[in-house]
From Swiss-Prot:
This is Phosphoribosylformylglycinamidine synthase subunit PurL. InterPro entries: PRibForGlyAmidine_synth_PurL, PurL_linker, PurM-like_C_dom, PurM-like_C_sf, PurM-like_N, PurM-like_N_sf. NCBIfam families: FGAM_synth_II, PRK01213.1. The active site is at 54, 100 (proton acceptor). Mg(2+) 1 binds at residues 98, 538. Its EC number is 6.3.5.3. Pathway: Purine metabolism; IMP biosynthesis via de novo pathway; 5-amino-1-(5-phospho-D-ribosyl)imidazole from N(2)-formyl-N(1)-(5-phospho-D-ribosyl)glycinamide: step 1/2. HAMAP family: PurL_2. Part of the phosphoribosylformylglycinamidine synthase complex involved in the purines biosynthetic pathway. Catalyzes the ATP-dependent conversion of formylglycinamide ribonucleotide (FGAR) and glutamine to yield formylglycinamidine ribonucleotide (FGAM) and glutamate. The FGAM synthase complex is composed of three subunits. PurQ produces an ammonia molecule by converting glutamine to glutamate. PurL transfers the ammonia molecule to FGAR to form FGAM in an ATP-dependent manner. It catalyses: N(2)-formyl-N(1)-(5-phospho-beta-D-ribosyl)glycinamide + L-glutamine + ATP + H2O = 2-formamido-N(1)-(5-O-phospho-beta-D-ribosyl)acetamidine + L-glutamate + ADP + phosphate + H(+). ATP binds at residues 57, 96, 500, 537. Its main location: cytoplasm. Keywords: ATP-binding, Cytoplasm, Ligase, Magnesium, Metal-binding, Nucleotide-binding, Purine biosynthesis.
Length: 742
């Protein structure tokens, strides 16, 4: 029971207690001006979460406006729970990515689990059935005991929630770098399927309509979670463990099915997840979007704990809760549906016409605030921006090729780097086949799910090489989008749209804000050229630990459409005798590469460059060749360069090998030049494929001897290794590191 006396309005101002909630002096003065009086404790708490970066994007809005958000297929862009893209036949795909970085740093299992739960609710609140989950994870070096603990617990949290709720986790990425040592990144993406007629919005329309609370009871977990997510991590962050929510996937499964049934009922007017800022954000945002107000009686809120105050109820981020607006007089229809699932559905208020959020508790009005001020009128900051000194130095430094004395040894070593190594240890914990629609499981360039009753399928991926962004955020931003699109194309799909998760450090530092601006410029340019609009996403700033920022990490989630399941393609070579091609030229580009990090222990120099027009041309040519049936396998060349891409392609259930000839010195095998693919083609399609893909160069063929042999044009042997030995090293690296005591 809460025994604390809340401070008075005067105390809040005089003692500047609002600063503890992340509200600045100027913001407090603005709040006072907007409402024409001093706010009470509940009201300043509500303003603090709604005006946090996590909810308001007050530091990032000027940057987000750069993104293209419309397109022929876009049915819903940014502004709702998730974006929606048309895929024909009156069907649409719904998807969104969200972060749960700060909670995962201090309570990794629950932090990751509730991140999955929250993004699933965002998707089904739009009326869609979630069909897949992906995740993009970043950790410090896997030699650290603390990092091993975080890694194991985060993966267990994702598996524990996703497996229980029955949604397959079909893909994602895991990368390791010292910059994430104290601040791991846990980004979760959910993809759903919907018929056009079932699309719902989070709007509180219709004066007098009933506001209903459904799902789990409200507790004290997660209070100020949104504020916690809007500040730097420090040694004292452990004290904020109560700001981490606790999830119940079985409750979420019931809530999902009940909500999807309610969506078929025309009594439903609007629906929204109680995510960041809980009851506060869902009520204020739904009213603001509809141009209405909401009045609620907090005495009616289902509570898990006794003696909860209005402040605690409004700021709680207890999981598995939704807010619904129902036609007046039809409440019992909704109650009956939720009763079937043994869930509470309680009328707690109604829609008004005065654009106010009015809350009653214990017979008193404890809050009366304008909804637009909460949801739309947070101050927007144009932060100072300054190019960091290291950037100019890197731009003027062509990173030399690291010395490669033995390319076979180097290939083995690269395949065992945790960022490149097989993530089988991770995805074997996920149920990626549940619901039996998964056609391409984790481990290829993208996850692929069929759409039952049609010939269509969806490909999905997440991508970002943060090292490139550290060296050059604009070029790195372009590359992140391009690599995601390459992965989609390699699966036989046309890239449709993007959801982005902008993970950066403290925007109040000019060098960090410069990174954000430049990365957004690069992402925007790539999305325009590749025709992949940004339909939603998330911003996670203040990712710093004791003053040290993470690498800039704008994760790109992308979905593509496969028109015919016959076009589905994977990265693995299929049969001996097929011809091996590389599309795109290899340049001596080693800055930010896995080879540079491994051999020199740091990254520096001018980042790899990308020509987006060439990228688009190659993607279109390859996709056309795939659709015509010329391509047996396709794999994009990324971390570790051509050598790693060929090795990954040759690791199949058959004991295949490859004999290829490449140009140049051994180190070039591991250059990370952009816009490249490794492709295999049947001999009978050689002429047609070469005519279709002008940039393709024939470098060898798939063999049946289980041997990877790579030589240069001078006849010098570069790599000579048994495929199964390479695969054993690649698959064993992460389990081996986790078992070691170091």
């Amino acid at each position: 029971m809460s025994l604390l006396l809340e401070p008075s309005k005067e105390q809040i101002k005089e003692e500047k207690l609002y600063q503890q909630m992340g509200v600045s002096d100027d913001e407090f003065a603005l709040i006072e001006s907007i409402i024409g009086r001093l706010p009470n404790y509940t009201e300043i708490g509500i303003f603090s979460v709604m005006w946090s970066e996590h909810c308001s994007y007050k530091n990032s809005k000027p940057v987000l406006r750069k993104f293209p958000t419309s397109g022929e297929r876009v049915l819903q862009g940014p502004g709702e729970g998730a974006g929606i893209v048309d895929i024909g036949d009156n069907q649409a795909v719904v998807f969104k990515i969200e972060s749960h970085n700060h909670p995962s740093a201090i309570e990794p299992y629950q932090g990751a689990a509730t991140g999955v739960g929250g993004i699933i609710r965002d998707v089904f609140s739009m009326g869609a059935r979630p069909i897949a989950v992906l995740n993009s994870l970043r950790f410090g070096e896997l030699t650290s005991p603390r990092v091993k603990y975080l890694f194991e617990e985060v993966v267990a949290g994702i598996a524990g929630y996703g497996n229980c709720i029955g949604i397959p986790t079909v893909g994602g990425e895991v990368q390791f770098d010292a910059s994430y040592e104290g601040n791991p990144l846990v980004n979760a993406m959910c993809v759903g399927l919907i018929d056009h007629k079932d699309i719902k919005k989070g709007q509180a329309k219709g004066v007098g309509n009933t506001v209903m609370y459904v799902g789990a009871k409200t507790g004290r977990d997660g209070i100020h979670g949104a504020t916690f997510a809007s500040e730097e991590m420090s040694d004292s962050s452990e004290e904020k463990r109560s700001a981490v929510q606790v999830g119940d996937p079985f409750m979420e499964k019931l809530l999902l099915e009940a909500c999807l049934e309610v969506i078929q009922c025309d009594a439903l007017v609007g629906i929204q997840d109680m995510g960041a800022a809980g009851l506060t954000s869902s009520s204020a945002e739904m009213a603001s979007k509809a141009g209405s107000g909401i009045e609620m009686n907090l005495d009616l809120i289902p509570q898990r704990e006794t003696g909860m105050t209005a402040y605690e109820m409004m700021l709680s981020e207890s999981q598995e809760r939704m807010l619904l607006v129902i036609e007046r007089g039809r409440e019992q229809e909704i109650v009956d549906i939720f009763d079937k699932y043994d869930l509470e559905a309680v009328s707690v208020g109604h829609v008004t016409d005065d654009k106010m959020l009015r809350l009653r508790h214990n017979g008193e009005v404890v809050c009366e605030l304008p909804v637009d001020a909460l949801a739309e009128e947070a101050p927007v900051y144009h932060k100072p921006s300054a190019e960091p000194a290291y950037y100019r130095e890197f731009q003027e430094t062509e990173a030399p090729a690291p010395e490669v004395k033995d390319a076979t040894e180097t290939l083995f070593a690269l395949l065992q780097q945790p960022t490149i190594a097989s993530k089988e240890w991770v995805y074997d914990q996920y149920d990626y086949m549940v619901r039996t629609n998964t056609v391409v499981a984790p481990g290829s360039d993208a996850g692929v799910l069929r759409i039952r009753g049609t010939k269509k399928a969806l490909a999905m991926t997440t991508d970002c090489n943060a090292r490139y962004l550290y060296l050059d955020p604009e070029e790195g931003g372009k590359i992140a989008v391009a690599e995601a699109a390459r992965n989609i194309v390699c699966s036989g799909a046309e890239p449709l749209a993007v959801t982005d998760n902008l993970n950066f450090g403290n925007p109040e530092k000019p060098e960090i804000f410069w990174q954000i601006e430049k990365a957004a410029d690069g992402i925007s340019e790539a999305c325009n050229v590749l025709s992949t609009p940004v339909i939603g996403g998330n911003v996670s700033l203040y990712n710093e630990s004791n003053g040290t920022a993470i690498y800039p990490t704008p994760v790109i989630g992308m979905v593509g459409l496969i028109e015919d399941t016959a076009h589905i393609t994977t990265q693995h070579f299929k049969q001996a005798g097929d011809l091996v091609y590389v599309i795109g030229e290899t340049k001596p580009e080693f800055a930010g590469s896995e080879l540079q990090k491994m051999t020199e222990g740091r990254i520096y120099g001018k980042a790899p460059q990308i020509d987006l027009d060439i990228e688009l041309s190659r993607q279109k040519a390859l996709l056309d060749a795939i659709k015509k049936g010329f391509v047996q396998s396709a794999h994009d060349v990324s971390e570790g360069g051509l050598g790693v891409a060929i090795a990954e392609s040759v690791m199949t259930t058959e004991n295949l090998g490859a004999n290829v000839t490449v140009e140049g010195e051994a180190a070039l095998l591991f250059s990370e030049s952009q816009s490249r693919f490794v492709v295999s083609v049947k001999k009978e399609h050689q002429a047609a494929f070469e005519a279709a893909v002008a940039d393709a160069v024939h470098i060898g063929e798939v063999t049946a001897d289980g041997l990877l042999a790579i030589q240069n044009q001078d006849g010098q042997q570069l790599v000579h290794a048994q495929t199964k030995e390479l695969e054993r090293a690649w698959k064993g690296a992460i389990p081996c590191l986790l078992k070691s005591k170091a």
